[in-house]
């Protein structure tokens, strides 16, 4: 089982993650994790904080001489902005100052419901942890998950599929080619024809003091049939993926495969017919069974079926606006325009990296549940035995 916890506030000294369940013998370096951290900080429409922070991970435990040793892995991402906040966010009582309390809650954020739940009269106690800054360390965890999955030729990649109603058309190309296209795009999209239109929209929205959302898509190839389970609600792979993606700040909807389109069609047009060709095995495929369509998005009955995993999710516009919405002061109860925190105009490209990370984490967990062992060597042996079984099935 692959599990993790994160800790840390947006303007605290650091973000921390502890990962348990990574087998011994996995090659892992700070450099490979930092690649994904840098991707998260890119993308057209990001805000001023990206000029301050240059995220770098520190591996504090669980890795020796470039290899995991089987014990919990501790990851740390320092907040460079901490030097400007060390008194405001200090754990020490001597720095307490009621004059810097934030009492104007922002619509669309956790500010008000969080303050009500935890009996806080300073919403900074809520907004610091609810901030999407937390996703930096989740991306680091996702990089570890991707390192594990890559040992078994499973690849995960996220893209921007839509921005502010402008839809990208996915080319019929292998995932590796789409990944290369997105890497060259400021918006992490696979459709270059709409990129300039998307950028113009972001510029317009910025000038208006507003924000814009979109739709991300995460694909995974090489996933074998048999991950997840139908026998309990909380082991269904699609349910796990949906929960993980919806846990990302500002995400409000998720679908697997064609998702909501299926509700407007008939069963004969939705369900993917099953075929068999023994020649596929000779060409290195995992199984002779296959589909000619993938409306299910690679998951049926909560179990991966061997086709490409396709997850799409909706991200709402960021609720921190430079043209703030009306709100109410939680102490005086007087109406005000909501507090303005430094923010992005559009974080959909960055969110595609975060979604990629959490999908990889869930796939790594499902993979370890199915093939788990204490070392990479043991897991590879287990996995090879399963592949031999599938080809004979």
UniProtKB/Swiss-Prot annotation:
Q: In which pathway does it act?
A: Metabolic intermediate biosynthesis; chorismate biosynthesis; chorismate from D-erythrose 4-phosphate and phosphoenolpyruvate: step 7/7
Which cofactors are named for this entry?
Answer: FMNH2
Enzyme Commission numbers on file: 4.2.3.5
Keywords, comma-separated and alphabetical: Amino-acid biosynthesis, Aromatic amino acid biosynthesis, FAD, Flavoprotein, FMN, Lyase, NADP
Top EC class for this record: lyase
Q: What does this protein do?
A: This reaction introduces a second double bond into the aromatic ring system.
Q: What name appears for this protein in its UniProt entry?
A: Chorismate synthase
């Amino acid at each position: 089982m692959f599990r993790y916890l994160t800790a840390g506030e947006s303007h605290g000294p650091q973000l921390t993650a502890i990962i348990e369940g990574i087998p011994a013998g996995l090659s892992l370096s700070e450099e490979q994790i930092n690649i994904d951290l840098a991707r998260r900080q890119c993308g057209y429409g990001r805000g001023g904080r990206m000029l301050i922070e240059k995220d770098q991970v520190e591996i504090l435990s669980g890795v020796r001489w470039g290899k995991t040793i089987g014990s919990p892995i501790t990851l740390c991402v320092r907040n460079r902005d901490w030097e400007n906040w060390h008194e405001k966010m200090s754990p020490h009582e001597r720095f307490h100052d009621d004059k810097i309390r934030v009492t104007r809650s922002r619509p669309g954020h956790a500010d008000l419901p969080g303050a009500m739940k935890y009996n806080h009269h300073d919403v900074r106690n809520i907004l610091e942890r609810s901030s999407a800054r937390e996703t930096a360390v989740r991306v680091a965890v996702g990089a570890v998950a991707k390192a594990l999955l890559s040992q078994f030729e499973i690849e995960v990649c996220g893209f921007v599929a839509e921005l502010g109603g402008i839809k990208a058309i996915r080319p019929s190309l292998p995932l590796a080619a789409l990944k290369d296209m997105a890497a060259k795009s400021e918006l992490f999209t696979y459709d270059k024809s709409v990129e300039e239109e998307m950028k113009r929209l972001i510029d317009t929205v910025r000038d208006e003091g507003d924000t814009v959302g979109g739709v991300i898509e995460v694909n995974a190839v090489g996933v074998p049939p048999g991950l997840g389970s139908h026998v309990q609600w909380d082991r269904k792979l699609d349910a796990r993926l949906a929960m993980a993606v919806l846990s990302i700040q500002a995400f409000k909807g998720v679908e697997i495969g064609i998702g909501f389109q299926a509700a407007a069609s008939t069963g004969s047009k939705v369900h993917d017919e099953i075929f068999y060709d023994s020649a596929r095995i000779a060409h290195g495929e995992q199984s002779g069974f296959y589909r000619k369509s993938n409306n299910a998005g690679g998951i049926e009955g909560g179990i991966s079926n061997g086709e490409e995993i396709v997850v799409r999710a909706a991200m709402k516009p960021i609720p921190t606006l430079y043209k703030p919405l009306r709100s109410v002061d939680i102490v005086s109860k007087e109406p005000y325009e909501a507090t303005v925190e430094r923010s992005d105009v559009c974080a959909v490209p960055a969110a595609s990296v975060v979604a990629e990370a959490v999908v990889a984490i869930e796939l790594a967990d499902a993979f370890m549940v199915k093939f788990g062992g204490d070392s990479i060597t043991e897991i590879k042996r287990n996995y090879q035995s399963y592949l031999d079984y599938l080809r004979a099935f």
